């Protein structure tokens, strides 16, 4: 895959999708959804030696996140991000 990105079968690409829950309350609200790159591989021995808690498997991933967004108010006073552009980048929410 020359550009480093690929699509997995059954998993849509990272793109804007309308949020049906918030959109039914007025103007459409969009959020980034879809798949990006991820892989897992055995942890190299030299890396294991530097880990506080050695792990046998190392994983790498990027997540579908907003590259740009605007703030919107829904349900009277709830502030949400209305995504306007998506890309695959650092995963902000993950288990440690």
UniProtKB/Swiss-Prot annotation:
Keyword Glycoprotein tagged: yes
PROSITE patterns found in the cross-reference section: GLYCO_HORMONE_ALPHA_1, GLYCO_HORMONE_ALPHA_2, GLYCO_HORMONE_ALPHA_3
Entry-linked InterPro entries: Cystine-knot_cytokine (IPR029034), Glyco_hormone (IPR000476)
Primary residence: secreted
GO cellular component terms given for this protein: extracellular space; follicle-stimulating hormone complex
A biological process term (GO) from this entry: G protein-coupled receptor signaling pathway
Glycosylated residues, chain numbering: 56, 82
Signal sequence, start to end: none
Superkingdom classification of source: Eukaryota
Disulphide linkage map: 11-35, 14-64, 32-86, 36-88, 63-91
Keywords for this protein: Disulfide bond, Glycoprotein, Hormone, Secreted
Compartments (UniProt record): Secreted
Gene Ontology molecular functions: follicle-stimulating hormone activity
Subunit structure as annotated in this protein's UniProt entry: Heterodimer. The active hormones thyrotropin, lutropin and follitropin are heterodimers composed of CGA, a common alpha chain described here and a unique beta chain which confers their biological specificity to the hormones: TSHB for thyrotropin, LHB for lutropin and FSHB for follitropin.
Family: Belongs to the glycoprotein hormones subunit alpha family.
Function of the protein: Shared alpha chain of the active heterodimeric glycoprotein hormones thyrotropin/thyroid stimulating hormone/TSH, lutropin/luteinizing hormone/LH and follitropin/follicle stimulating hormone/FSH. These hormones bind specific receptors on target cells that in turn activate downstream signaling pathways.
Protein name per UniProt: Glycoprotein hormones alpha chain
Organism placement in taxonomy: Eukaryota, Metazoa, Chordata, Craniata, Vertebrata
